[in-house]
């Protein structure tokens, strides 16, 4: 059978989006890996699937698969594209929608200027909720990688993140340290690793090594986690502009127990069909 799909991106973080509300199919990890190959398939960072909700309290179910076939809890850039997709496909006429994900419920708001604001919910900071192996919650943790001590913050935005402060993201060891920290045993479910450069209290640069993907042009949940870590440490103040290789995100966080609000673009690239 042929499935209709849309290719989209949020700041260069690219997605294949499938509507499984009006289409019916069982997508397996082998299909995701086949389609995700940039040489022989469609090529993407993540596959986003739109499904009917399992509860009357939400509008849709939102599932996310990395290009390696693994299903993950959350994707902030994908959430913005999800909101734009369901509007463009007339799956809803609402400007504000509630969506269930593996990492919890999020709220998406489409603004008149085309930007999308995502209420990511409050960050999870307790080690057991991230998950991260530590005896107690702290602003930062020291872990060892190949005999080297690394200090990082641990934050969950529905998915686990480690955030390191660096002097300059251009020279940061993203491709050497990133994959080692991603699979560090203190992150039982692996982690996305952010390298944060603070420019001033309201402006920072960020590169992210994403779990199961590698470095991407942008990571929405990574930007949220970096802003939270920076605000908790006193390096940053809300609102924060986070510059990623693919562009800029606007992050707001009022403090513990409050939701993180992320605003940024969502762009449709092309429509296509793929054989299942």
From Swiss-Prot:
Originating gene: dapF
UniProt name for this protein: Diaminopimelate epimerase
SUPFAM superfamilies in UniProt: Diaminopimelate epimerase-like
Binding-site list for substrate: 13, 46, 66, 76-77, 159, 192, 210-211, 220-221
Function noted in UniProt: Catalyzes the stereoinversion of LL-2,6-diaminopimelate (L,L-DAP) to meso-diaminopimelate (meso-DAP), a precursor of L-lysine and an essential component of the bacterial peptidoglycan.
Associated pathway: Amino-acid biosynthesis; L-lysine biosynthesis via DAP pathway; DL-2,6-diaminopimelate from LL-2,6-diaminopimelate: step 1/1
Important for dimerization, annotated site positions: 270
Catalyses which reaction(s): (2S,6S)-2,6-diaminopimelate = meso-2,6-diaminopimelate
Record-level GO cellular component terms: cytosol
Family per record: Belongs to the diaminopimelate epimerase family.
Documented EC number(s): 5.1.1.7
PANTHER family named among the record's database cross-references: DIAMINOPIMELATE EPIMERASE (PTHR31689:SF0), DIAMINOPIMELATE EPIMERASE, CHLOROPLASTIC (PTHR31689)
Record's subunit section: Homodimer.
Organism: Pseudomonas aeruginosa (strain ATCC 15692 / DSM 22644 / CIP 104116 / JCM 14847 / LMG 12228 / 1C / PRS 101 / PAO1)
Species classification: Bacteria, Pseudomonadati, Pseudomonadota, Gammaproteobacteria, Pseudomonadales
């Amino acid at each position: 059978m042929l499935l209709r799909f849309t290719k989209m991106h949020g700041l260069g973080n690219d997605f294949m989006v499938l509507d499984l509300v009006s289409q019916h199919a069982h997508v397996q990890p082998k299909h995701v890996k086949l389609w995700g190959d940039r040489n022989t398939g469609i090529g993407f960072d993540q596959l986003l699937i739109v499904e009917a909700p399992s509860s009357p309290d939400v509008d849709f179910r939102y599932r996310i698969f990395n290009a390696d076939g693994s299903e993950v809890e959350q994707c902030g850039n994908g959430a913005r594209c999800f909101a734009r997709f369901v509007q463009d496909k007339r799956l809803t006429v609402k400007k504000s929608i509630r969506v269930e994900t593996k990492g919890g419920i999020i709220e998406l708001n489409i603004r008149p200027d085309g930007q999308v604001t995502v209420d990511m919910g409050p960050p999870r900071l307790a080690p057991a909720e991230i998950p991260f192996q530590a005896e107690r919650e702290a602003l930062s943790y020291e872990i060892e990688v190949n005999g080297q001590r690394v200090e990082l913050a641990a934050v969950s935005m529905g998915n686990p993140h480690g955030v390191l402060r660096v002097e300059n993201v251009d020279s940061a060891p993203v491709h050497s340290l990133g994959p080692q920290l991603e699979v560090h045993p203190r992150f039982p479910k692996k982690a996305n690793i952010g390298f944060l450069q603070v420019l001033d209290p309201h402006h920072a640069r960020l590169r992210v090594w994403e779990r199961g993907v590698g470095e991407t042009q942008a990571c929405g949940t990574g930007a949220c986690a970096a802003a939270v870590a920076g605000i908790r440490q006193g390096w940053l103040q809300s609102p924060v502009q986070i510059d990623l290789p693919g562009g800029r995100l606007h992050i707001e966080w009022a403090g513990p127990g409050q939701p993180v609000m992320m605003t940024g673009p969502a762009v449709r690239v092309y429509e296509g069909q793929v054989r299942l």
